[in-house]
Amino acid sequence: MTQTLSQLENRGAFIERHIGPDAAQQQEMLNAVGAESLNALTGQIVPKDIQLATPPQVGEAATEYAALAELKAIAGRNKRFTSYIGMGYTAVQLPPVILRNMLENPGWYTAYTPYQPEVSQGRLEALLNFQQVTLDLTGLDMASASLLDEATAAAEAMAMAKRVSKLKNANRFFVASDVHPQTLDVVRTRAETFGFDVIVDDAAKALDHQDVFGVLLQQVGSTGEIHDYSALISELKARKVIVSVAADFMALVLLTAPGKQGADIVFGSAQRFGVPMGYGGPHAAFFAAKDEFKRSMPGRIIGVSKDAAGNTALRMAMQTREQHIRREKANSNICTSQVLLANIASLYAVYHGPVGLKRIANRIHRLTDILAAGLQQKGLKLRHAHYFDTLCVEVADKAAVLARAEAAEINLRSDIHNAVGITLDETTTRENVAQLFNVLLGGSHGLNIETLDKDVALDSRSIQQSMLRDDAILTHPVFNRYHSETEMMRYMHSLERKDLALNQAMIPLGSCTMKLNAAAEMIPITWPEFAELHPFCPPEQAEGYHQMISQLSDWLVKLTGYDAVCMQPNSGAQGEYAGLLAIRHYHESRNEGHRDICLIPASAHGTNPASAHMAGMQVVVVACDKNGNIDLDDLRAKAEQHAANLSCIMVTYPSTHGVYEETIREVCEVVHQFGGQVYLDGANMNAQVGITSPGFIGADVSHLNLHKTFCIPHGGGGPGMGPIGVKAHLAPFVPGHSVVQIEGMLTRQGAVSAAPFGSASILPISWMYIRMMGAEGLKQASQVAILNANYIASRLKDAYPVLYTGRDGRVAHECILDIRPLKEETGISELDIAKRLIDYGFHAPTMSFPVAGTLMVEPTESEGKAELDRFIDAMLAIRAEIDQVKAGVWPLEDNPLVNAPHIQSELVAEWAHPYSREVAVFPAGVADKYWPTVKRLDDVYGDRNLFCSCVPISDYQ
């Protein structure tokens, strides 16, 4: 039969590229699970009353090439002015060797958060380097492995200051008036929910205020002034006030470390170490504190430990501080950090080294000095005598200056009374400075760059002598040996080889949705039209961004069944926080601000209670029945008991137990009956798209993990995006922004992140995914995700009991394998199985969540039948190994499971085990071998001997 032109055009070609099993393989798997078709399987699993009659209308699929061309045209509407706005964002030069070998490399961007350290040593080393950079530049003892952005880090610093303060009755937090406005905005949002009073005043007046538990200062003020706060910090410390200082990585190369001046906490953005502005993000924040406060620090910390053979190995330390363990008592709710961006900054420091960084910082400062000298020579006045890279210039005719700047395609900071702000960066040249003279002075000014350079080189006093750094930085060998591109390329490759990412094998982590991050989706993020825009540039310069964001928002509205979407949250956890704040403010608008009870099922992800606590709510736990579903009787009782103060319920759908609960609509109705709102966690949205939707189910607000369902890669632990969808009555209460007016905002709510649209530069990834999949492709993706999970469950259920199932014994898009009976019989644990899977070439499933002693498996739709079968065969082979232990063939204390993973050096070492080397490292005929570089880590040693800076170089060799 002759094919039609439409068939030959094959506009849905990407659907077949994204979805792993082809039609024939899908039918094989359907036969294995006993279903006739994808629609029949979905019909059996998803409750009838929540199934959509037709898929959401998000358009037909486009080919990769058509979608790229369409997005390129949209990006072309952005105007690439040279931005000297500053305010925490500058243009950068990302070294091409890092661009090609990390940012564009799936070996780096498709990895997961390093909870399994044995398969994560490469990015853990890069993160340890990031911590070392932070320690050297801040002068403090402990550093985290990144936070979401600078403003979030400021809010975390405030919360930490309260936790560690000895002034228990103090409830006021002082913020210096020249911090960045977006930082103050986010701090105020957080302070409101915690009940703190925020005082904003000139830093010199910090001592005038009583009952202050913490103070936030900024070393280089928002308008450029360098402050020597050593005397003030000393006086504040005498009063037992916790002092936090916001700092700039590049400025710290030349300026004295705030830790050396007595600061307790130092934080800031690492953006200018090689990470493009990207219209606001993603960017990594750095965070450091004194050793005495280490157990109160937010975020992840990479620590040096030992493996089972006594060799140095790295791991995430002190995880008991995190939300997946401590729930509402966690230090923060940060589930996603910014690993990929922290590692770019880390490798930027490695590549340039201390000499290169000082050259860059000195060049920026020299050009700023030249600009300042020329302007002063022509009679213009500078607001500040001491500066690093930013000048605040008083101008008589501000409108004329701004008009000349616009004509020259230059952005200056324009929100300062009778003055303009100018921030230079590593991309600034002498030609740029000459152009700035023309903009600020008009025509024939007669200034000569070379002459000015000679003058300032002989006598520069723009940095106070007391503020000049007098100690060495980055002395560790890792920052002093990889300065040629060849060496750098090989170093990065050596790190990459240590890790297991999606470019090598399936990552079957439950509740994580480790699906394909297609190359066509990733390409646009490095386009300069998207990468080079300042988040506070005039809106007419970002029309392409606004069109793309508007289209993506419209698609997400249709896919979720909500009425509006807010793009600001930088992670799923931050989305939860933003959604709960919207609920809180909604109740307050109805004079029901007393409603503060948040119902959370016992099965919930730990981020839920941590977010509720952060939003100022009290958590009340709702029981689950023996099948893992929400206990409706207990829900009704709790809702009625707390009816007067009920704020909301947080529920995940499909449930965290991997089933579609039949009573989800009834759950929503009960909560609404007693005046509460329904927060539906979007972590499992990959099993809803095109089949049902939160809004259709009856929820009021959800966050969407764009780094799960909508293909933004996990980056080894970030970036992420957690936009929230809301019903119309909550739309006025989503986050706003103090610097940029967000279109459609009816009221001005506080911000939750530094940039108005969060990590805007990675939104093209989700735009591309939806555009290339279309309505039918998105539905098919959800259906195949469900098929893949049920195929695994059906083939493994006789070897490993599936803990929870729904109707007809089916699961949703993931399944929980119960290891507890095996452990009771044999002593082999879920940890042993997880580590043994490494020998088979797999990342482990999610361990002991949501139920201790289990493994939760989520294959996603992107894995083909061959990879699923390989995983199933590995799990069955491991079950056979467990039976060998049970039968006494191998002793419990010495077998391939408890000794896993095995490393290459064991092949040539003395062998005294009761199983062969072949069984150890090539089990069940494994051919495409992944080699871990360390054996199982000693977690207890790592936490008891916390060490978070670089180890001797010999340990890397």
UniProtKB/Swiss-Prot annotation:
E.C. number(s) listed in UniProt: 1.4.4.2
Reactions listed under catalytic activity: N(6)-[(R)-lipoyl]-L-lysyl-[glycine-cleavage complex H protein] + glycine + H(+) = N(6)-[(R)-S(8)-aminomethyldihydrolipoyl]-L-lysyl-[glycine-cleavage complex H protein] + CO2
UniProt-listed InterPro entries: GcvP, GDC-P_C, GDC-P_N, GDC_P, PyrdxlP-dep_Trfase, PyrdxlP-dep_Trfase_major, PyrdxlP-dep_Trfase_small
NCBIfam families, sorted: gcvP, PRK04366.1
A single GO molecular function term of this UniProt record: glycine binding
Cofactor dependency: pyridoxal 5'-phosphate
Keyword Oxidoreductase attached: yes
Entry keyword Cytoplasm: no
Summary of the function given for this chain in its UniProt record: The glycine cleavage system catalyzes the degradation of glycine. The P protein binds the alpha-amino group of glycine through its pyridoxal phosphate cofactor; CO(2) is released and the remaining methylamine moiety is then transferred to the lipoamide cofactor of the H protein.
Protein name per the record: Glycine dehydrogenase (decarboxylating)
Self-association state and partner proteins as the record states: The glycine cleavage system is composed of four proteins: P, T, L and H.
Keywords: Oxidoreductase, Pyridoxal phosphate
Family indicated by similarity: Belongs to the GcvP family.
GO cellular component: cytosol; glycine cleavage complex
Modified-residue entries (N6-(pyridoxal phosphate)lysine), positions: 708
One annotated GO biological process: glycine decarboxylation via glycine cleavage system
